[in-house]
Amino acid sequence: MKNLPNYLTIARIMVIPVIILLFYINNSLARKLGALLFVLASITDFFDGYIARKYNLVTSFGKMFDPIADKLLVGCVTIMLLKKDNVDEIPCLLILAREFLVSGLREFLALVKVSVPVSRLAKLKTFLQMFALSILILGSKGSGIIYLDIVGEIILWIAAFLTIITGYSYFKACKTYF
């Protein structure tokens, strides 16, 4: 594994326990550092794919583990926020359920040689998920901004709505196999 995109994917996975640890320290500096690490990890999601495609560094490892790293990052942070910060369960559960279902559908579609390209709306969904989770990690406790948690939850609801809409394209691609 001698390429930068794969290292970025691995780094995204390895930073998850650090983000969780900083979150549970539960002071302003730890929250800020945790949110910063989450933002940096989220940015690597863009760069690993971009670099892999631009410099012809696409690998089987990257194809398999990039989406796993994304799901782990979003899933672990979402569960962490649910457990500790009283974040609304409904958008979190919608996001988590969609991610698991779409992962399974993508695997199935790959087996039957059907490709579903990632839409711009799906990219917006991912950005909004990451943005909302960043805000919620920082929260009012880390920022001193009283209503930051509410802003984060509103963005999370928007992301959950887009999650349902974008997940439909995968079900639509599978309908001939049901």
Swiss-Prot record:
Name of the gene encoding the protein in the UniProt record: pgsA
Function: This protein catalyzes the committed step to the synthesis of the acidic phospholipids.
Superkingdom as given in the UniProt entry: Bacteria
Entry's EC annotation: 2.7.8.5
Molecular-function GO terms, alphabetical: CDP-diacylglycerol-glycerol-3-phosphate 3-phosphatidyltransferase activity
Compartments (UniProt record): Cell membrane
Keywords of the record: Cell membrane, Lipid biosynthesis, Lipid metabolism, Membrane, Phospholipid biosynthesis, Phospholipid metabolism, Transferase, Transmembrane, Transmembrane helix
InterPro entries cross-referenced by the UniProt entry: CDP-alcohol_PTase-I, CDP-OH_P_trans, CDP-OH_PTrfase_TM_dom, CDP_ALCOHOL_P_TRANSF_CS, Phosphatidylglycerol_P_synth
Main localization, broad class: membrane
Name of the protein: CDP-diacylglycerol--glycerol-3-phosphate 3-phosphatidyltransferase
UniProt topology in membrane: Multi-pass membrane protein
Transmembrane segments: 5-25, 32-52, 61-81, 145-165
GO cellular component, one term: plasma membrane
This protein's pathway: Phospholipid metabolism; phosphatidylglycerol biosynthesis; phosphatidylglycerol from CDP-diacylglycerol: step 1/2
Catalytic reaction annotation: a CDP-1,2-diacyl-sn-glycerol + sn-glycerol 3-phosphate = a 1,2-diacyl-sn-glycero-3-phospho-(1'-sn-glycero-3'-phosphate) + CMP + H(+)
Tagged with keyword Transferase: yes
BP GO terms, sorted: phosphatidylglycerol biosynthetic process
Lineage of source species: Bacteria, Pseudomonadati, Pseudomonadota, Alphaproteobacteria, Rickettsiales
Membership in a protein family: Belongs to the CDP-alcohol phosphatidyltransferase class-I family.
